[in-house]
Every structure is written in C-alpha cells, then in structure tokens.
Amino acid sequence: MGCVESKEAKAASARSKVIDKTLKADREESSRQAKLLLLGAGESGKSTIVKQMKIIYLNGYSKDDCIRMFDVGGQRTERKKWIHCFEGVTAIIFIVAISEYDLTLAEDQNTNRMVESLRLFRSICNNQWFVETSIILFLNKRDLFEAKITKSPLTICFPEYSGANNYEEASRFIQNRFENLSGCEKGKDVYSHFTCATDTNNIQFVFDAVTDVIIKTALKDCGLF
C-alpha cells in the first residue's frame, strides 16, 4: 500500500517552497543592489550628506540600478554597532571634516578630531572585512576649512607641517596624510574628493563619480575589468 502524505506534511512542504522562493528572490535582489557604508567620526557631516542624497534621488533608483546606503553613528560609543553592517559591502564612503583640525572630540576633550579620524580611517583600511573593498574618501566641509586655514594654522594638529596656511597646500597635505594610511601603494582602491555637504550640486557631482566606482567594482567582480 502506498504512503499517503498527511495534510500537515503537505502544508509544511508548501511553506518550505514559499520560503525557498522568497529567499531566492531576496538573493537575486541583493545581487542587483550596491551596498554603501557611510563611516566617519562624529560631527563629520554624514547626516547632511544623507539628506542631500534624499534630495538628489527623491524618486529613488530604478529597479535595476539600486543602491542601499547605511549610515551608522560615528561617536565612539556607537562604533561597536558597525560590525553588523560589514558583510557584503560594495564600497565605503569615509567622511572626515577637514575643518575640524583644531577641535577636540565632544566625548574626549584630550583628543583632536582630525587625529581621531586618521586613526579610524587606518583601522577601516586595515580591517580584514575590507581587504578588497573600494574606499571613497570625502574630505568634507571644505568651505569652512578654506575660511579657517588663514586664521588657524594647520600646525595645531600637525606640528610637522611646513607649508603655507592656504587652502591649496594645507588641503593637499591632509589628503596625502589620509591616502598614505590607506594602503593604496599595495593596490587598494581609494578615491578622494573634497566636498561641501551643504552644496547639493557638489554632492551630486561627487556622487556621480561614486557611481562610476560602483560600476567599476561590479565589473571587477565579474572579471570584466
């Protein structure tokens, strides 16, 4: 006599098929999405950049061109949450407020904000999760930096700095300090941009370049670059 499947077994089998179908659809959707992780110390301007993204992409991306952006808190007490966002990252946008070279952390009055950002950037670049992950460096608040640098010398943060206290030389020095920590000499992809988070046109221009990085990463993953 043949074995007759019970109603419960049939229901369980049907549920299993639905779950498998849903998981497959989720994997396919995830493969079409680029995952961007926004990192940086507190007060770097991440929240403002997220607001600009909402303005620029008010209607969102197309179904076939989707980017998911994760903004996590930058203060020390919030960084322990970062590890939960590390898996499957397409690229990292690391944001540093270059105008805060003469300020200290809100949570630690003995630590310079620029020094903290340098330490954090180095730890991200050397993290095992991001060995092959492209990093986009936003040197943010360039407008405030340009207004401040002629009045407040860069030597407050970098005693070894011997250049002029003007935007061109001082900003180039800061850029080099970050890029020297990135491991770019070992082939790691790091893309630097000077940004003003309150300038929508500037952020749109920069984010167009970020999109190019995402496309390049996707092609590299497919062996086409």
What are these regions (language model features)?
Residues 5, 88-225:
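Conserved GTP-binding G-domain of TRAFAC-class P-loop NTPases and closely related GTPase folds
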Residues 46:
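Conserved lysine of the Walker
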Residues 38, 78-87, 123-127:
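Short amphipathic alpha-helices and their capping/turn segments at secondary-structure boundaries
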Residues 42:
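The conserved Walker
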Residues 16-28:
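Pre-Walker A adenine-sensing motif
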Residues 69-82, 100-103:
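Switch II (G3) loop of P-loop NTPases
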Residues 1-12:
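Charged, amphipathic alpha-helical linker segments immediately N-terminal to NTP-binding catalytic cores
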Residues 35, 50-68:
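P-loop NTPase motor core
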